[in-house]
Amino acid sequence: MWQAYVRFKSGSTTRADVGETEEEARGALQDAMSQLKSNGIGIVGPNLVVTKDDLEFIKLEQKQRD
């Protein structure tokens, strides 16, 4: 499982699952970035919404397994 690590300008952070494979995760992140560019709001994963004004950065990482 791959997840997006999101940091907001306020300093808070969160993670959201975005894909089973790296390719799927990269596609989901590209979609979110396209949404941000076109309307200022992007959906990262199934339940995380970010805005261009609040977002500092997003990076992909492989989810740690227990």
Regions found by a protein language model. Give the residues of each.
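Short aromatic-glycine-(Arg/Gly/Cys) micro-motifs in beta-strand/loop hairpins
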Residues: M1-S12
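Short acidic, gly/pro-rich beta-turn/loop elements at beta-sheet edges
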Residues: T14-A16, R26, L60
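A short, charged, amphipathic alpha-helix used as a generic interaction element across diverse proteins
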Residues: E20-G42
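Short amphipathic beta-strand/extended segments with alternating polar/hydrophobic composition
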Residues: R15-E20, T51-L55
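Short, mixed charged/polar active-site loops
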Residues: S12-T14, N47
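Short, mixed-charge low-complexity intrinsically disordered segments
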Residues: L36-D66
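Residues that cap or initiate secondary-structure elements
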Residues: S12, E22, Q64-D66
